[in-house]
Amino acid sequence: MEKPVVLGTLGTVYGIKGWLKVNSFTDVAEAIFDYNPWLINQNGVWREIQVSSWKRHNKGLICKLDGIDVREDALALTNVEIGVAADLLPALPEGEFYWRDLIGCSVVTTKGYDLGKVTELMETGSNDVLVVEANVKDAFGAKERLIPFLEEQVIKNIDLTARTIEVDWDPGF
């Protein structure tokens, strides 16, 4: 099985009937419930579980999972990751990408200099930022570069098949 896409985590237990708080990583928090069944990561093993009910509670979300009917069963699920199969995510329009697809891509300047590989992305408010781990023998001595994800200005081309991102960026920066 391909590693699921993590959309959130289960939080603390709520009440005595097996309800759990939900920490959603989706842009719209409630969108995590658009996917059913969930895959949960318990002790490194992903297993499928159905969401039987959910609701807003105070400023957060809580859910009831099939087969989890008492507080003690719910306690075993606190802090586990919630994932879904990647093929359940909606297709994106041309030119848009999921962050998970960009992680691991090589980043190369328009002049052919290999800057390294994308290890993560950060949301800064004004624009997203690629975190690029530099190659071991980087000529500029860089260990990591933060490159703004500004299409057309900085990001010139993304080829997911070749797993490369071409950027207009000074390697010394």
UniProtKB/Swiss-Prot annotation:
Family matches, as SUPFAM superfamilies: PRC-barrel domain, Translation proteins
Alphabetized InterPro entries for the sequence: PRC-brl_dom, PRC_barrel-like_sf, RimM, RimM_N, RimM_N_sf, Transl_B-barrel_sf
Keywords: Chaperone, Cytoplasm, Ribosome biogenesis, rRNA processing
Coiled-coil boundaries: none
Location in or out of the cell: Cytoplasm
One Pfam family hit: PRC
GO cellular component labels: cytoplasm; ribosome
Ranges where the PRC barrel domain occurs: 94-173
GO process terms (BP): ribosomal small subunit biogenesis; rRNA processing
GO molecular function: ribosome binding
Function of the molecule: An accessory protein needed during the final step in the assembly of 30S ribosomal subunit, possibly for assembly of the head region. Essential for efficient processing of 16S rRNA. May be needed both before and after RbfA during the maturation of 16S rRNA. It has affinity for free ribosomal 30S subunits but not for 70S ribosomes.
Assembly and interaction partners: Binds ribosomal protein uS19.
Family membership noted in the UniProt record: Belongs to the RimM family.
Note on domains (UniProt): The PRC barrel domain binds ribosomal protein uS19.
UniProt protein name: Ribosome maturation factor RimM
Encoding gene (name): rimM
